[in-house]
Amino acid sequence: PSARVTVTGGGTGVGISALLDQTTDIAMASRAIKFSEKMKAKAAGEDLAEVPIAYDALAVVVHPSNPVKQLTRQQLEDIFRGKVTNWQQVGGDDRKIVVYSRETSSGTYEFFKESVLKNKNYMSSSLSMPATGAIIQSVSQTRGAIGYVGLAYVSPRIKTLAVSYDGQHYAAPTLENAINKTYPIVRPLYYYYNRKNASVVAPLLDFILSAAGQKIIKESGYIPVHKE
């Protein structure tokens, strides 16, 4: 049977707020629901269900002309917190580092802060972008730029960096490395919905979690939740 699905962007926080306001049937989230959001749902008498539908690797990206090929988690933390400000400090050219980030309502912003910055704050002068496409465009046009995007959005316009969390073993952001867990910056992606609307959202959820749906997820550059 056919179904009409309307998708609106804005970030995880926007989606969950829309779900709590009952202006959407499903909130797509790139982070787990926050305690404060759970409390709002409880106060409104809403019973929210969480369904992991895929996993996503976050790629650290720079301008294609940047000679740097890899960074450690600590180096990334120092860059995004403003402690390292010149590419020369991490083996690159003598060029100022321009940091691009997602806006605070983004689940991607939250996850990168949690996984890479260990919940420390981003530098105040980082440039917040409203969407992944804006980060890709800005990084592709700025020689000293660095940012982060979901693996599915990686394009030849930008260069990805290999990352190491132990300072010894580096892995490039590829689907294969994300699946075999050698690449460290990987997060679950969720669908949230109100249980009272289960009958409305069930057909879409059933399809997403089916073999056909998970095949589309993998072909789109994401990691399926079900092993083939």
State each model region's role:
Residues 1-228:
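Exported/periplasmic ABC-transporter solute-binding proteins
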